[in-house]
Amino acid sequence: MFTVAIIGRTNVGKSTLFNRLIQKPMAIVSDTPNTTRDRIFGIGEWLKRKIAFIDTGGLIAKQTPLQQLIALQVQAALSQAKAIIFLVSLQEQLNSDDFYVAKVLKKNKDKPVILVVNKAENFNPKTAEETLKDYYSLGFGRPVVISAAHGIGIGDLMDLLVKQNQLLPNENNDDLAKIRFCVIGKPNVGKSSLINQLVKQNRVLVSNESGTTRDAIDVPLKVNGEKFLLIDTAGIKRKGKINMGIETASYIKTKLAIARSNVILLMVDGSKPISEQDEVIGGLAQAALIPVIILVNKWDLVLKNNNTTNAYKKMLKLHFKHLDFAPVLFISVLKNQRLNTIFEQLKIIQSQLETKVATPLLNDVIQQAQLYNQPPLFKGKRLQITYAVQTKSQIPHFVLFCNDPKYLHFSYARFLENKIRENFGFNSVPISLYFKSKNARIRTKPEV
């Protein structure tokens, strides 16, 4: 996917622009410098073309321990980007940090840099040459003038990015397959060996040394006539230890791979206890809000009895509490055991993602659920759901209209979720329920 890194000094509006480009409030926006320390990824769309954006921390010339880490993360983002937005501010004069950023970007000679002047709400096109003359000194030509906060000039910027994308070799891998899945997990759980088994050839470096796979590699697959796209990533080390360039790059590549996927394979080592590191990686899978398959590898090394499998599943639920929808497959990559079940499960998930529930049937289930189990009282008032509908989304998404969302208890939301799962076969995918007042236009979160 065409990937663009947003680079600039502190407090020029990078996160505001990022949120505008992906049309979602993912990044924290603050007037405080260095608010964005970890990299944030999102996908925007313009003229039916998808573009991945990387939000980055502010680069400054002064080298502190924090700034050195941010610089490493920015370099990793630059290594993944195919184009760069260099963001500066019209509300402040250019300073030494802007020129420092320009110097860093000039080292990436093989990638186009678009100079963007932000915070230009009061920009007057009639005096453009006089206003912008200082920005030419950065060495990146005529700037694009925008206001990220007000949406001014964003269309022109997106047009430029689409043109840059068209100049690059065409990459169709994302569009070849309905199912795009990535494999994530801590280093040395067998991810690379799994991919080698699935594609029947050595596409990635395999070693007993922890963390030997560095790049995200797209592997188009065709199984029984079905097209899949497998996105391999490096194993994720503990986030606190991601302080060297190569591991920072691996972490970024993993999150980019997740952003491009519609299914995640979360791989754990069945011969070892679930670790805190596994739980952190499980949190990444949960946060993606897409289907997850848990692969328990090295199952051939486990001594078993009649209860071993069920006991392990219960243990997984304790460690991955919010992934209870995720199917669990017990495999051995080394012995090539039960690997075919991965593609079988992927097809089941795809079928569930494509399931559309007829509105009358959905409302019958919701009304019957309310008759069977009334919502609990909230300050003497009871929730009443009058209408429900499934809306288009990446995962099954249901909007439930009610008298007042504040009467909803989280346990009743979970009860309704389970009823929808039971009646319509959504047993292997996450689903989302939004509760709205009958007269409201915005989402209201349930009170817990």
From Swiss-Prot:
One of its GO terms (biological process) is ribosome biogenesis. GTP 1 binds at residues 8-15, 55-59, 118-121. It comes from the Bacteria. Gene3D superfamilies: 3.30.300.20, P-loop containing nucleotide triphosphate hydrolases (3.40.50.300). One of its GO terms (molecular function) is GTP binding. GTP 2 binds at residues 185-192, 232-236, 297-300. InterPro entries: G_ENGA (IPR031166), GTP-bd (IPR006073), GTPase_Der (IPR016484), KH_dom-like (IPR032859), KH_dom-like_a/b (IPR015946), P-loop_NTPase (IPR027417), Small_GTP-bd (IPR005225). Residues 2-169, 179-354 form the EngA-type G domain. Residues 355-439 form the KH-like domain. Keywords: GTP-binding, Nucleotide-binding, Repeat, Ribosome biogenesis. GTPase that plays an essential role in the late steps of ribosome biogenesis. Belongs to the TRAFAC class TrmE-Era-EngA-EngB-Septin-like GTPase superfamily. EngA (Der) GTPase family. PANTHER family: GTPASE DER (PTHR43834:SF6). Associates with the 50S ribosomal subunit. This is GTPase Der. It comes from Mycoplasma genitalium (strain ATCC 33530 / DSM 19775 / NCTC 10195 / G37). The lineage of its organism: Bacteria, Bacillati, Mycoplasmatota, Mycoplasmoidales, Mycoplasmoidaceae. The gene is der.
